[in-house]
């Protein structure tokens, strides 16, 4: 049986890293990439090649392929997966259930976090010029009905899941440009105690988007962050979340989702370049196994942080170099 040991690090600008291997472990191999683009493309390929096609996975594939299209556009490469995107959109449209939303498979009963992933994918596709057949008014009516139906039970829910659902519904209605009484809904949701850090962060994001006067200062959100041994920032509940049968199937309530929410808040607040870089580094630290955990998280991480890393300068990226034991390398990928 062979066993490997290693370290993963993100080197920004002129950063230096001291790595002292254990001679008893044998030969050391160093692999370096010049930018994060290959990591994104690898993640996109993993999502694209994933063999199963539940509604979440199809929506995640759409998101991933749209991200691939943006990368290819940047580098002047021909995108050849339009038919694949169109086919996925057609299947998602056919799987919309009688409640105008989506469940795990086919036209099963609604799962709100899956519906959110699907709706976001459809809206992103429309922005890129694809036809989705999405009936926005019917969808708006369904989401608004779901919001009103869930409100009474949310105030007394101690798990945070009901509040999380309300936040998702209001967020989707905003993305659909629905004409609803946002101040009333925001005030009600904000009045519900936060049972989780995710509740607190998502409430802050809702207020930032819809009621800025009630938005907490960015510094107060940074005070809630945790740090990895490498100094990367992430957001985790200090106490373990109460286990429930539903929570196992709620990937939208996790450290990753908390950290993505914090990232979006700080990006929108502006003047937080250093903090955003440390958050991105956290996500790359989580790829120690070579990929993120699942199609849902991978697609959401890529769509959130990738645009900020597509720093374009005359159509090319700034030159990168790496010095190892005094020897400079300028061609990547590098393996030695």
Sequence positions of predicted segments:
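Extended, solvent-exposed functional surface patches
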Residues: 1-158, 167, 250-251
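Long, domain-scale non-catalytic interaction/scaffolding regions in large secretory-pathway
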Residues: 12-22, 157-160, 166-336
């Amino acid at each position: 049986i062979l066993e490997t040991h290693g370290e993963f690090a993100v080197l920004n600008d002129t950063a230096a890293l001291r790595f002292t291997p254990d001679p008893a472990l044998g030969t050391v191999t160093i692999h370096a990439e010049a930018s994060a683009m290959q990591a994104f493309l690898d993640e996109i390929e993993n999502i694209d090649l994933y063999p199963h096609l539940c509604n979440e996975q199809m929506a995640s594939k759409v998101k991933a392929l749209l991200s691939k299209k943006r990368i290819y556009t940047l580098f002047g490469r021909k995108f050849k997966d339009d038919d694949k995107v169109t086919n996925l959109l057609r299947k998602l449209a056919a799987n919309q259930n009688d409640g105008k939303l989506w469940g795990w498979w086919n036209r099963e009963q609604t799962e709100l976090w899956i519906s959110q992933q699907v709706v976001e994918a459809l809206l992103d596709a429309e922005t890129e010029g694809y036809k989705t057949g999405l009936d926005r008014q019917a969808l708006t009516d369904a989401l608004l009905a779901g919001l009103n139906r869930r409100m009474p039970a949310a105030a007394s829910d101690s798990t945070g899941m009901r509040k999380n659902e309300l936040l998702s519904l209001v967020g989707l209605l905003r993305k659909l440009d629905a004409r609803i009484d946002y101040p009333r809904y925001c005030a009600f949701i904000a009045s519900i105690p936060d049972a989780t850090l995710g509740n607190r962060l998502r409430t802050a994001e809702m207020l930032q988007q819809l009621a800025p006067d009630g938005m907490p200062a960015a510094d107060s959100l940074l005070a809630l962050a945790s740090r990895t041994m490498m100094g990367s920032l992430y957001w985790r509940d200090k106490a373990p979340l109460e286990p429930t049968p539903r929570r196992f199937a709620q990937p939208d309530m996790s450290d990753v989702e908390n950290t993505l929410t914090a990232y979006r808040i700080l990006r929108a607040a502006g003047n937080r370049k250093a903090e955003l870089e440390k958050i991105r580094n956290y996500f790359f630290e989580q790829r120690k196994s070579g990929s993120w955990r699942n199609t849902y998280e991978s697609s959401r991480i890529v769509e959130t942080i990738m645009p900020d890393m597509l720093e374009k300068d005359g159509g090319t990226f700034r030159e990168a170099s790496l010095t190892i034991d005094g020897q400079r390398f300028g061609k990547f990928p590098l393996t030695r």
